[in-house]
């Protein structure tokens, strides 16, 4: 991928205390400064497919607090998605992959002491400020299937940020991933999401695996670091089962509250919530609609592609769209039963 700066970090760089104060000028970590300044420089030099300024945003009335944003250019200017036929589809070197990008799109290499590197590159069709792609060991050409390193890097980047608005996510093949080359998304969203504090019940104590009580139901893991090995293994054991059964899925990683049965109204966001949503697969070329149901939409962040849908959207219409992509209740029950037997 060419020469670039290397961002080296240790556990000492993790930010332990984060508070959702609602203020624009929060304290910034070394990671935030590197990402925000590098991303802004790339934007100013015209490397993006369109210029992303402040997006028109509205919070939909209702209990879910959906964050709707109008991002017409992303809907029209982004790279055409690859055709996906299976959650376990092999990497194809003939297709676009992140070894083929313009070297100027590379922000820096992320490297934990004495461990493997992860390339941090700009998403040239950004959905929000700071939108980047985390690509673990791109030269190894991993397909879009989560690995231990990918999950660990995702959690650690959230811990490296002092901004509770920094989010990380993953779309599996069949879950609206656009490129079959292992990558995660990272971006800043300066709005609180219900998912940060929504209630959850414990379903598998040996894995500290919880289930979200509210719509859309998904599996929840929680960690405050720095010892991440157990939670990373638990997450991978779940996603491995989904891949083995060809079940598409989306992940969302965000600062959040410890899981409990009652919603947490405090502003403390010291840990990381990792939510895994098994979902119906969408194979073949992507369908175009008001919005694709993927990692950020399931978390309550809705980038709309056209003004008409943006202005007419209600909590009810959004839930109806999302519901169509969730596993039916019977399949969800069968999956939970299988997980309890094999994990």
Curated annotation (Swiss-Prot):
Its EC number is 2.7.7.78. Specific and highly efficient GDP-D-glucose phosphorylase regulating the levels of GDP-D-glucose in cells. One of its GO terms (cellular component) is cytoplasm. This is GDP-D-glucose phosphorylase 1. GO terms for biological process: glucose metabolic process. Belongs to the GDPGP1 family. The gene is gdpgp1. It is found in: Cytoplasm. One of its GO terms (molecular function) is guanyl-nucleotide exchange factor activity. Its main location: cytoplasm. It catalyses: GDP-alpha-D-glucose + phosphate = alpha-D-glucose 1-phosphate + GDP + H(+).
């Amino acid at each position: 991928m060419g020469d670039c700066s290397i961002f080296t970090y240790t556990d000492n760089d993790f930010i332990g205390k984060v508070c959702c104060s609602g203020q624009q000028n929060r304290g910034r970590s070394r990671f935030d400064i590197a990402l925000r300044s590098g991303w802004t420089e790339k934007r100013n030099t015209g490397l993006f497919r369109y210029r992303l300024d402040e997006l028109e945003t509205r919070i939909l009335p209702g209990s879910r607090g959906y964050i709707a944003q109008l991002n017409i250019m992303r809907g029209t200017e982004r790279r055409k998605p690859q055709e996906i036929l299976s959650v376990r589809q092999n990497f194809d070197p003939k297709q676009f992959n992140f070894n083929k990008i313009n070297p100027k799109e590379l922000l820096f290499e992320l490297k934990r002491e004495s461990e493997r590197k992860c390339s941090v590159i700009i998403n040239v069709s950004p959905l929000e400020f700071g939108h980047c792609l985390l690509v673990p060991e791109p030269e190894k050409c991993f397909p879009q299937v989560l690995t231990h390193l990918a999950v660990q890097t995702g959690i650690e980047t959230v811990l490296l940020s002092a901004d509770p608005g920094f989010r990380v996510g993953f779309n599996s093949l069949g879950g609206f991933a656009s490129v079959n080359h292992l990558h995660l998304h990272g971006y800043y969203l300066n709005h609180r999401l219900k998912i940060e504090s929504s209630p959850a019940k414990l379903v598998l104590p040996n894995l500290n695996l919880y289930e979200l009580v509210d719509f859309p139901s998904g599996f929840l893991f929680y960690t405050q670091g720095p010892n991440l090995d157990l939670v990373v293994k638990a997450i991978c054991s779940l996603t491995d089962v989904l891949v083995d059964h060809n079940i598409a899925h989306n992940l969302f990683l965000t600062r959040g509250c410890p899981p409990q049965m009652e919603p947490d109204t405090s502003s403390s966001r010291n840990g990381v919530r990792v939510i895994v949503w098994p979902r119906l697969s969408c194979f073949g070329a992507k369908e175009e609609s008001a919005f694709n149901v993927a990692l950020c939409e399931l978390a309550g962040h809705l980038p709309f592609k056209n003004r008409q849908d943006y202005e007419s959207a209600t909590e009810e219409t959004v839930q109806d769209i999302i519901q169509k992509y969730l596993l039916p209740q019977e399949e969800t029950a069968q999956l939970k039963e299988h997980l309890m037997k094999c994990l």
